[in-house]
Every structure is written in C-alpha cells, then in structure tokens.
Amino acid sequence: MAQSQPPSKQYAVLLKRGPKWVAGKPAGEQALGNHGRYLQEQMTKGALQLAGPFLDDSGGLILYNARDEAEVRAIAKHDPGVVDGILAVESIRPFHLAFDAASGKSPFSAAK
C-alpha cells in the first residue's frame, strides 16, 4: 500500500530588509528579479499561496503551503533574495487561512 503524504499546512513567512538592501532604493529598484522568479516557481509547484511586499518597503509576506515548518525553512533558505542578502527571514509562523476571498471559503460559507 502506498504511503500517503501528510496534509499540507500553511505558514506565514515575514521577510525584512537584509544586509545587502541598497539604502535609498525602493523595492522595485532592488536586485530582486531572481527572488520573483523563485516565488513564481514555488507558486507553480503549489507551495506558494500568496506573496507581496509591504508598501513601506520594510519587507514582505509570503504564505506557503507545506508539510511542516522544516520544509518552509528550506524553501525560504533557498530564496535568492535571502541567499543574496537583499532580504532576510524575520519569522515563520503557522497560519490558518480561515477566510479566503479567492475561493470564497470561510467558516461561515454555506455547506455544499
């Protein structure tokens, strides 16, 4: 009998400016192209649920689907923005997406 995969959980990754963030340059002018491509790859794989920068250029938020925190830490560790030092992981926290506007799901949705 095939062993089933553990259910996917959600984790919020908070990013902050890293040591190689160029002061005085907004996020759109930082060397984050590889970071964006990496996030696209994670989205294609089904790991990334949503992501975006904070409007004050202090960092950003990524919501990942993963088996456990170790998997999320590995994904974040290999993010080119983190590897290059432009970004740094501030925290990783378990998250429960209770209200999802994209799917219309919520604890108050009518059962179908």
Predicted regions, residues:
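Conserved, structured core segments of small domains
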Residues: M1-K112
